[in-house]
Amino acid sequence: MEATRTSFGLHNAPLCPTTNPSLFPRRWLHKHTLSLKPAKQHHLVCVRATESNDNLESSRPLAHFSPTLWGDHFLSVPLHVAEFDDFSREIEVTMKPKVRDMLKSSKNSDNERIRLIHLLMNLGIAYHFEIEIDEILGQAFGNLDDIIAKENDLETISTMFEVFRLRGYYMPCYAFNRFKGEDGRFKESLAEDIRGMLQLYEAAHLGTPSEDIMDEALSFTRYRLESLTSNHTATASPHLSKHIQNALYRARYHNLEILVAREYISFYEQEEDHDETLLKFAKLNFNYCQLHYIQELKDLTKWWKELDLASKLPYIRDRIVEVYFGALALYFEPRYSLGRIIVTKITMIVTVFNDTCDAYGTLPEVTSLVDSFQRWDLGDIEKLPSYVKIVFRGVFETLEEIEQEMRPQGRSRIVQVAVDEIKKLGKAYLAISKWARASHVPTFEEYMEFGMQTSMDHFAAYSFIAMEDCDENQTCEWYKSRPKMMEALNGVFRIKNDINTFEQEMSRGEVAKGLNCYMKQHGVSKEEAIGEMNKIYSNYYKIIMEEYLTTTAVPRPILVRCLNVSRPIHHFYKERDEFTDPYFGMLKEVITSLFIHPIPL
């Protein structure tokens, strides 16, 4: 028996439950298995650009995207209401009271409580105790100077720094000065404290633009941890060494919170002093969350299948599962189910829009499509080519149905903000398409002006739609003011994307890319350009953290969504574009660990 939405706390009315069959007739769908062998690709007739303006405008880009890796897999995964009920009952009745008592225990010092909170965060169960954690941290932050003065343990200070900053408290970095020698450098003796070094490495990712000491800490710890893990006579235990390797590959701050939990549970289970209650709670919670994710993927796969765009528009990237993975980065807690569904639907349909502009449409077709988006009128598309009508109708109807769904909750205005962002995306897509058709390489600054508009801020806007516990007008006004945090998010995405998709996109003739623009403008090698762009990238990350810690115009839940926006790029674009080509790389394994395999209890 398949679990229904109402069985485990989702909204009674399904979001966008049906699609007009006359608008989206069913044809055929890819039915690929989970085989890791790439399936046969669709081949579109592509005409290369020539020097003739007419030919230039009528040419189609050359792009062949691999089909979906997952097909209809999640539609066949069985789910039972009893599973949800059993997990929920044990979590609520047995686990939560025990852990709540741990947090409130008078035997624990402030430092011990903070370390417990850190453990709960890493295990993915801190969200169950938001009120208790806020009370503990609020009280401790008021006594921070005294706490720091009495503490000289590197791991503890670094843990406090990570906890306070990720929870929105601006703990100063001067606490790390005590670990420096007379020469102003971090003491070499610290390298003997392996766990302290690892925790300092994680904390070092949370610096702001003026905190040079955090850059020093990152360089100091990374070099020594890399040496430690590459040394065959290393003193770290095998499971700790593996944990360090994982951190060096992808720091916690750059990972999805639920993936941090998945990996940390495996590590924590091998710790000799692990707490059985916390370990069991973490396993139950992960499996409970996983059931929600599978149900949501079933709903989304059904929705995507009914739209049937993968067969009608075979040039697009059919990536509903990968898009959902990105939405999961924004919020993993079960209560945000509706938010994940909304973000996935909008992002997937915007991906269709993007691929039409980048990978198939001629310049006149792209121009007419973008113009239609500016007018935002379904009755004004009769003159569009048939396939362009399908693209516009798909985006328009998806947003209209979401608006109808959210109107009773008083969330229409934020949906309109999302529509405005899509219109802005269209203008940027058109500008970049013109460059591509003309093989024009703009200056780096010109490119970034439009490239930043196709980055991450719109993703944040989509995530606000279902944040019913936050004031809509307050959120909209802040977002529309174009805060520095949004610019920094765009910069992080744009640079990471352009560096790690460079080879793939240049092979498709997409010469107007940030890395290529920088190389040409400054007359430097690829390696030199990457080095300079990474400096810009690093500074953007610092701005994100600074804005997260200092912004007061919106509540912390909104800022957390923004902080989380950048997390999936370290999976999609870690070394290459795994979103576009998911058959090669680690992304498919990560998705499998989240959505296919539960943790044995």
From Swiss-Prot:
Q: Where is this motif: DDXXD motif?
A: 354-358
Show the taxonomic lineage: Eukaryota, Viridiplantae, Streptophyta, Embryophyta, Tracheophyta
Species whose genome carries this gene: Arabidopsis thaliana
Name the cofactor(s) required for activity, per the record: Mg(2+); Mn(2+)
**Entry note about domains:** The Asp-Asp-Xaa-Xaa-Asp/Glu (DDXXD/E) motif is important for the catalytic activity, presumably through binding to Mg(2+).
Provide the primary localization: cytoplasm
GO MF term list: magnesium ion binding; terpene synthase activity
Keywords on this record?
Cytoplasm, Lyase, Magnesium, Manganese, Metal-binding
UniProt record, GO biological process: diterpenoid biosynthetic process
Family annotation (CDD domains): Terpene_cyclase_plant_C1
Q: Does the keyword Cell cycle apply?
A: no
Q: What protein name is recorded for this chain?
A: Terpenoid synthase 17
> What InterPro entries does this protein's entry cite?
Isoprenoid_synthase_dom_sf (IPR008949), Terpene_cyclase-like_1_C (IPR034741), Terpene_cyclase_plant_C1 (IPR044814), Terpene_synth_N (IPR001906), Terpene_synth_N_sf (IPR036965), Terpene_synthase-like (IPR050148), Terpene_synthase_metal-bd (IPR005630), Terpenoid_cyclase/PrenylTrfase (IPR008930)
What gene, per UniProt, encodes this protein?
TPS17
